[in-house]
């Protein structure tokens, strides 16, 4: 499909108020062979609500942590220690194994200047990679635009109940779905009927009719491919109690799509732990840890473990001191986790100091989160356009060999 034809189809698709089913055709394709980086996949997992980084990666070697958190601090004998300073929450056996296997890079102190404590605003900053700018497209969307010529299926798949701002783009339309068994066109009844009628017309006598016919066929085929991928998918790998849609992503990778960008989230502000945090937070972390570990076990089974990297983030961390409700309030800097067989595991960036908090008892950020994005864009996806995509040049981290 030519770029012009693709663009017109997308404009018509948007004009008909359909769910964004396809940017072109969702054909399963064989892998590109001319360049290794063309096989590479980036999966982004969002932990919505503001995950408490301090009780996720516990600085058990620092007494100040326990002074700030006398009731909800994770006891040293319960921590899953990964070195002399840090250890994971007791519920995170999956993360512990990934780190000790050398598959996890932990980027400390990720944030931005003039941080917002609003879920909506801070998430928008992370989604757009443009704090305080009013930017309306997402960084994944702009990355997808830069990769249009690399793939023959859709550039971005967003598994969620609604499209994330992170994947919003100009010129391409991500595939967005939630349940593979109920992946349907969501337009008005008359519009759905129109496309169904057009798809049965056969030969079209006008270019406009042919465009609409292409849309109808593409939408129908996208629906069938998502369903068929899920039905064919070998669900033998254990993702734990809550797979967080990572098994759905695995099903599409298994099916053979050459889609390079996937985005999903642990939804509904699940990590917003203001009250009675300890048990709830550990349970949420167990779900996430088990699901991520299961996903990479699945990639190993599919022989794609060298092709896939996952970024895990939250819109902000939590305030350092516990509150009077045995929870934590909205904070600032947090960890970002980069996971994959191709990752150089270890610690990156400077951990914020517990004895140098801001006036609100929050961490001072030490790593601009867009350094992580720039690293993934250039050193993983193999594009040189990170400055254009991020609208500024950022120093990269040495996460990849």
Q: Where on the chain are the PLM-derived regions?
A:
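Conserved H-loop
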Residues: 305
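Feature for exported/extracytoplasmic and membrane-associated proteins, marking the mature portion
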Residues: 1-302, 321, 335-401
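C-terminal, helix-dominated tail/subdomain
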Residues: 325-336
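Acidic/histidine-rich, metal-coordinating catalytic segments
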Residues: 309-316
